[in-house]
Every structure is written in structure tokens, then in C-alpha cells.
């Protein structure tokens, strides 16, 4: 059966490491989503690849079983927030990209909700324990937020940011910086 303590890689590296277009695209994603390294992109690609593989395998099933399994997979992806409408089909699953998954990361949602000024500050607030989901501290910026948890994201109860959230301020040199309110 295997040792339960043995951890496995959750990603697959690109087949060819030096493709200029892919490197440029990955650099753009690193900046847009405030990722630490390309491994986080590869993990997102692997998760999406798994869902797309499941959707392709549905096409080979008999119609009765296919309808049941398709409904289960669409329901799971709706709950995760990767699909937007209940009438989603296998084609919608096959059109998912890693950007769809990166949009559901806690780091991205904290930034988009306005709890931080930058995507990088969102990562720092999460890793330092200032962010809670449903009242529970979450310290992983890569946490995938479900749709029902999205409105429950706030500062942690004992966080100093709860009473004084960060605000943008114009400093003397004309630079914009973070200042405690």
C-alpha cells in the first residue's frame, strides 16, 4: 500500500525548459498573482490538467453514467468557483486555464477584496497570520477559496489590522506607501 508519510510532487515541470514564449507568460503570471516561484504556476496547471482529464474521460462513458458523473464534476467545480453557471458543460471544463484557478487563491481574493494594498502585501498578511477564513486563521496563500467561503474572509480576531487596516498614503517624496490608519 505504501508509506502514508511519503509525500509526492504535486506538479509537473515543463517538457522543454527554455521556450521563450512560455517563460515570458510565466513571468507575467508571477507578477500578476504575486507568486513566489514558477512551481506555484505548475501546481495550478497540474490541478487544471487533472480536471480536464476527468472531463475528457467522461466523454467515453455511456450516456446514463456520463450524466451522473458530469453533474458531480460540474458541482465540484461550481463549489470551487472555477465554473460560473449551473448549466456548465464538459466544454466549459475543457476550456479552464490555470488563471481561473489562480483567481481562486486566498492571496488573490484578499487583494481583490481590498484587505491589502498590493498582491504582495496580501501574501505577507496571510503568511503572518493576519487573515482568517470563517474565523479560522489560514497561513497558506495558495489556499483555494470555495464560493461559500469567499464572503467569510476577514482579518483574524487578534490581528492588529482588525482595528487599523492598512491605507494608501502619499509620502513626502511623491512615492505611494503603506501607512497605518
From Swiss-Prot:
Residues 104-172 form the S4 RNA-binding domain. Pfam families: Ribosomal_S4, S4. GO terms for biological process: ribosomal small subunit biogenesis; translation. It comes from the Archaea. HAMAP family: Ribosomal_uS4_A. One of the primary rRNA binding proteins, it binds directly to 16S rRNA where it nucleates assembly of the body of the 30S subunit. This is Small ribosomal subunit protein uS4. It comes from Saccharolobus solfataricus (strain ATCC 35092 / DSM 1617 / JCM 11322 / P2) (Sulfolobus solfataricus).
Amino acid at each position: 500500500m505504501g508509506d502514508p508519510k511519503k509525500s509526492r510532487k504535486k506538479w509537473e515541470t515543463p517538457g522543454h525548459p527554455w521556450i521563450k514564449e512560455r517563460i515570458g507568460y510565466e513571468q507575467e503570471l508571477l507578477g500578476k498573482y504575486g507568486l513566489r516561484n514558477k512551481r506555484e504556476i505548475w501546481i495550478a496547471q497540474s490541478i487544471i490538467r487533472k480536471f480536464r482529464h476527468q472531463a475528457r474521460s467522461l466523454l467515453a462513458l455511456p450516456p446514463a453514467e456520463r450524466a451522473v458523473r458530469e453533474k458531480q464534476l460540474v458541482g465540484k467545480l461550481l463549489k470551487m468557483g472555477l465554473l460560473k453557471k449551473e448549466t456548465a458543460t464538459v466544454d466549459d471544463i475543457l476550456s479552464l486555464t490555470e488563471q481561473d484557478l489562480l483567481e481562486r487563491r486566498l492571496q488573490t481574493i484578499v487583494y481583490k477584496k481590498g484587505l491589502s494594498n498590493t498582491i504582495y502585501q496580501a501574501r505577507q498578511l496571510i503568511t503572518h497570520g493576519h487573515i482568517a477564513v470563517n474565523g479560522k486563521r489560514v497561513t497558506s496563500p495558495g489556499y483555494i477559496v470555495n464560493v461559500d467561503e469567499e464572503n467569510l474572509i476577514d482579518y483574524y480576531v487578534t490581528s492588529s489590522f482588525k482595528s487599523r487596516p492598512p491605507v494608501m498614503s502619499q509620502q513626502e517624496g511623491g512615492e505611494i506607501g503603506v501607512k497605518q490608519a
